[in-house]
C-alpha cells in the first residue's frame, strides 16, 4: 500500500529490490493498471499481509522498549506526522535513498515500511537494541604481595 504526500492511498504490487534505485517506482495496482510514481511524491510504502485492511499503521509508537535487534528510531515526516520503528544497524542501508522500517505492531497488517528520504524531515535514534558485543573485563591483578613463595 502506497501513501502519497497528498494523503491518497494506492493499493499496488511492486518489486521491493528496486526501491531506492531510481527517482521513480513502478507499480501494478490491484485493478491491473501499470503506473510509474515519483519517489518525491510518496510518503511511505507499506508492505502488508492483505489489502483488505485500509489502515496503514495500527500503532505508531512502541509501548515498551523493543526486543528486535537494530536501531530504534523515530521518523518525523515533512507533514509533522511521526512513526517509530526498528531499522537495520547498518549505516550503508540507511544513508542513501530511504529507510526500511519494521513497525511497532509486529502482529498487525503491515510487515515493513519503506520511507523515501524525500518524505522525512528528521530521523532520531532512540536506542540501540541487540546483543552486547563487549568483551568480558580482564581479571584485576592482585596488588597484595604473597606471604610465602609457592
Give the residues covered by each predicted segment.
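Conserved RNA-binding domains used in RNP assembly and mRNA/RNA metabolism
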Residues: 1-150
Amino acid at each position: 500500500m502506497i501513501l502519497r504526500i497528498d494523503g491518497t492511498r494506492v493499493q499496488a504490487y511492486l518489486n521491493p529490490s528496486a526501491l531506492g534505485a531510481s527517482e521513480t517506482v513502478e507499480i501494478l495496482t490491484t485493478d491491473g493498471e501499470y503506473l510509474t510514481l515519483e519517489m518525491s511524491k510518496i510518503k511511505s510504502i507499506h508492505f502488508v499481509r492483505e489489502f483488505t485492511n485500509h489502515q496503514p499503521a495500527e500503532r505508531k509508537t512502541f509501548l515498551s522498549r523493543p526486543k528486535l535487534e537494530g536501531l530504534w528510531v523515530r521518523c518525523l515526516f515533512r507533514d509533522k506526522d511521526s512513526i517509530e520503528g526498528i531499522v537495520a544497524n547498518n549505516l550503508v542501508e540507511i544513508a542513501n535513498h530511504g529507510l526500511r522500517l519494521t513497525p511497532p505492531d509486529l502482529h498487525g497488517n503491515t510487515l515493513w515500511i519503506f520511507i523515501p528520504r524525500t518524505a522525512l524531515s528528521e530521523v532520531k535514534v532512540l536506542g540501540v537494541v541487540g546483543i552486547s558485543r563487549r568483551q568480558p573485563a580482564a581479571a584485576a591483578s592482585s596488588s597484595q604481595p604473597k606471604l610465602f613463595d609457592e
